[in-house]
């Protein structure tokens, strides 16, 4: 049977990629259908109960700046908020929140059900319809056909998913859910490169059997941050702490003694796991000289006894998992509620995608999330948003849109995937971005909200809030420029108490704020510069824009310089071994290929823009910068 209604966009999968992929075209006014095998797991946090972190928090802010859901859901579900790297520069500061799984899922489902132009249907998809090299719809398990102009596939770990616990394994998309076996078989028939990846999750613990009194407590921030630019602290539920324990020599001995029962170390698992979220088996074998590894005990919610032990992802047999848990301080008598496991699944080479996340082989078919080789809720959601936007633009016969590396971390993510591909689960870090001072959490709305407004992604309330913030920033900067303090001023004593050396010349508010020892809060406590802005976000922007103005201008100049250096020649005698800042991998590839220009070097697989920056700096130091035509 063909379903009587036809759609502009069909989204397959209701995880973090799928929900953002469905909401975006619906907000843009397109008739959208979200298909999921189970409506009760929409927005499910399959692994750790947390959103954000280094690099990941930046993605969440970008999603939010474009009207996405993830940050808003986190503000309503977050039970512990922290600003990571708060003592460091603004480029690497990041917001992270522990989330109540139930509250998060409820928030996501409510948003989906209340979104105009969006329909939801529960049924497993087993086939993608392709006519004349163009996606035209999907077929469900019961033979129901849905027709659409575009299709977005966000299958997560479900494609030919296989769950491993010890030497036993079975088909599954995640614990308790079936694998998408028929859909995986159908996709393998398409002209796309496919491979296998692996990820894992730790056992879940019974909080009633943990001795928290002997463990270090990790509270959230006293001044609570918010995740969304539209968020309010009052939206947060009750806040609770996490706790910290450690593995020890006994733990490591247990693991080493049972590697012959590990599916990873016996060759049963073929897929490659995430480098930056390794299993406890990998940690012990790769870092055997360590006395212990820190394990964070993260509550899964306010109304559950489940605790997530972040740091002991494992696929070892259940009896070994019990021994590992009981070997750690505070967990000597702890019971396991759910076993940890590893899962293998199909992913498709992202080099077969356009930067819009549309497949090159099949027009109108988009991939987003773990199907593209990424790991993490945030990476998936960012891809879902981008795929949803471009599916909608295609239906509207409008030009596609995707951010470049100097505009958003989403641009870094997509450029890395589509240009370099990946052989292991890819995650975002601030270190992957060469212009990270421009890509801060705090200015994601300044970078992206005007674009979102042009695309029709945000409502009038968000647009008005954004414009008010921009006006506040401009007015406050102008106000600080107009307030002058000279050495004979009545306020000079108050100023001199804050600065390292007394004033000897007339300065204005911006001059003072540029000094490292003065921040906006201290400055506006001085009567001459009072009152401070009530708008916390605007106040933060004022301080960063003034204090880092020179560095920010330098990065903009660097972007222009990179564009100019496309045809810059690399001398044949250049010695890459003398460039200590390059990784061994990058150095080896450059020596092997011997590129004749910077542009050519930048297109070698595995040579990152950050490596090109290092190369340019060293060429300049050695007086070797030459321009030429290739």
From Swiss-Prot:
It holds the Pfam family GIDA_C_1st. InterPro entries: FAD/NAD-bd_sf (IPR036188), GIDA_C_N (IPR049312), MnmG (IPR004416), MnmG-rel (IPR002218), MnmG-rel_CS (IPR020595), MnmG_C (IPR026904), MnmG_C_subdom (IPR047001), MnmG_C_subdom_sf (IPR044920). NAD-binding protein involved in the addition of a carboxymethylaminomethyl (cmnm) group at the wobble position (U34) of certain tRNAs, forming tRNA-cmnm(5)s(2)U34. GO terms for molecular function: flavin adenine dinucleotide binding. GO terms for cellular component: cytosol. It is found in: Cytoplasm. One of its GO terms (biological process) is tRNA methylation. Its main location: cytoplasm. Disulfide bonds: none annotated. Keywords: Cytoplasm, FAD, Flavoprotein, NAD, tRNA processing. NAD(+) binds at residues 273-287. Gene3D superfamilies: FAD/NAD(P)-binding domain, GidA associated domain, C-terminal subdomain, tRNA uridine 5-carboxymethylaminomethyl modification enzyme MnmG/GidA. Belongs to the MnmG family. This is tRNA uridine 5-carboxymethylaminomethyl modification enzyme MnmG. FAD binds at residues 13-18. NCBIfam families: mnmG_gidA (TIGR00136). Homodimer. Heterotetramer of two MnmE and two MnmG subunits. Its cofactor is FAD. PROSITE patterns: GIDA_1, GIDA_2.
